[in-house]
Design a protein with these regions (language model features):
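Dynamic "connector" segments at or just before major functional cores
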Residues: 1-163, 167-189, 194-208, 400, ...
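An anionic, glycine-rich sequence signature occurring as long contiguous blocks
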Residues: 1-4, 236-342, 429-438
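Conserved nucleotidyltransferase catalytic core and NTase-mimicking acidic/glycine-rich helix/loop elements
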Residues: 4, 370-401
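Structural motif
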Residues: 12, 42-51, 302, 351-361
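Short amphipathic alpha-helical "interface-anchor" segments enriched in bulky aromatics
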Residues: 70, 320-363, 367-376
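Acidic/histidine-rich, metal-coordinating catalytic segments
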Residues: 141, 212-222
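Short, surface-exposed connector motifs at secondary-structure boundaries
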Residues: 206-213, 232-233
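Short, surface-exposed basic-aromatic patches at helix termini and helix-loop junctions that form
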Residues: 227-236
Length: 438
């Protein structure tokens, strides 16, 4: 049977979930704050800063970052209504206004602040229970992004061995809400500029939750400055030590004398212990783990024992096993990095300018948190087709199942209705999510 393909006069959309995105953005002051800013080269813009910003967030929530993708929505009546914009900008207008605002107009701080305010109203980051206390994890780390083969400003050799950027992120809670981000040249060391970033991250995190924070950092952030910042801010911390060439055999002997031993398998013994060291005249607890292997997991006997030593600074009074377990959970943030890079398709940033790409990253921070809120709103909803219990829904799942939902926009009798197809099992969850987040 041959089908006749033709254009309909009905208003149909493949991205009905953007209505929920628009509803959440209407809970913020993003539009009014951006519209109050006067750019030097555009004091009276034809398309308001708020419309430009909200339109771009609508793109990012579909997993698109290239400015040219906005052209598909310029005559999209549903996109305009859902996002609450008067005019959808063209691709050149979007690019030019972001270039003009980047790094000098304060847009970056506004995006971070409005994102934090939205999380404070709509999110409750999950804590971890440690010694009878609830601590909200604050995980900070760098995630190299591959931009090989480009001549973008700031692209340089990363520690992963390719050319790209080295953005740093601060994730809050078990769910991984982003409270701070910053785009950095690929060659920059993890610690460069981190003291300022760390202070700001703690401020943003505390604007979201009033509970105690547990900061977790890897060995690239082993610095006395970071420890002092945590102590001054009264934040609990676990920071992996960079042993910097210290003798592993010496630490192994110390662990054998002062630590407790367990043998997880024949040929592998693990010692764990704790000691107190002096840092800038103040005592700081250190956890040490030493591993000695005489055989491999497959049973192969080693000619000489293999020794592996790891250590962590911590403010927690708990036993070494608890501290190490909490630090190992820090690795979950690699999943959050992956979602930003792949699910939001952000690794290859759209501009050739470092400042503009950093502004794009702040837009992505807000878009990511909106999608995360939508994913968290699925829990406890009996109409959601997914039944497997999880702590969070992957961003890709939210985009695929909720954002890309087909529907029909009906304007009749002074009412505007969004109708999804009969039998579409994701329609009721979207309706409930909009009601829950309203």
């Amino acid at each position: 049977m041959r089908l006749v393909i033709e254009e309909s006069k009905e208003i149909l959309t493949t991205h009905a979930g953007l209505y929920a995105v628009g509803e959440l953005l209407r809970k913020t002051k993003l539009r009014s704050r951006l519209n109050a800013i006067r750019l030097a080269g555009r004091p009276e813009p034809e398309i308001s800063h708020g419309d430009v910003a909200v339109s771009y967030i609508g793109l990012l929530c579909q997993g698109k970052n290239d400015f040219d993708h906005i052209e598909a929505h310029r005559e999209d009546d549903f996109f305009r209504r859902a996002m609450g914009v008067r005019v959808v900008p063209s691709s050149p207008t979007l690019r030019q206004q972001l270039d003009e605002a980047a790094g000098q107009a304060g847009w970056e701080a506004i995006l971070r602040e409005e994102s934090a305010h939205l999380l404070a109203r709509k999110a409750r980051p999950t804590a971890v229970t440690v010694g009878g206390r609830d601590l909200v994890p604050l995980d900070i780390d760098v995630s190299p992004w591959d931009n090989s083969g480009t001549k973008k400003e700031g692209v340089s050799r990363t520690y992963h061995g390719y050319d790209g950027y080295a953005p740093i992120f601060a994730f809050l809670g078990v769910e991984g809400f982003v409270v701070h981000s910053e785009l950095r040249p690929g060659k920059d060391h993890s610690q460069k500029g981190t003291t300022k970033f760390l202070r700001e991250s703690i401020i943003y995190a505390r604007s979201v939750t009033g509970r105690l924070l547990l900061l977790r950092l890897d060995a690239g952030f082993d610095s006395r400055d970071n420890i002092l910042i945590c102590r001054d801010a009264r934040v609990e911390f676990i920071i992996k030590r960079n042993l910097r060439g210290e003798s592993e055999s010496v630490w192994l002997e110390w662990a054998k004398r002062h630590g407790s031993m367990r043998e997880p398998r024949p040929g592998k013994r693990v010692w764990r212990g704790a000691l107190v060291c002096d840092v800038e005249g103040k005592p700081v607890r250190m956890i040490v783990e030493a591993v000695e292997r005489t055989t491999r997991a497959n049973g192969q006997v080693l000619l000489l024992p293999e020794v592996e030593v790891q250590a962590w600074w911590t403010s927690l009074p708990d036993d070494p096993d608890t501290v190490i377990r909490l630090y190992q959970e820090h690795g979950t943030m690699e999943q959050f990095h992956s979602e930003i890079k792949t699910d939001l398709d952000l690794e290859r940033l759209p501009s050739g300018k470092l400042a503009t790409n950093n502004l794009v990253l702040q837009f992505a921070l807000l878009a990511y948190n909106i999608l995360r809120l939508m994913g968290q709103a699925m829990f406890g909803d009996p109409t959601v087709p997914l039944r497997k219990a999880r702590q969070r829904r992957r961003i890709r799942t939210v985009i695929k199942d909720l954002i890309y939902l087909a529907a029909r926009l009906v304007v009749h009798a002074r009412q505007v209705r969004l109708r999804y197809g009969q039998g579409n099992r994701w329609g009721p969850p979207l309706r409930r999510i909009c009601e829950a987040l309203a």
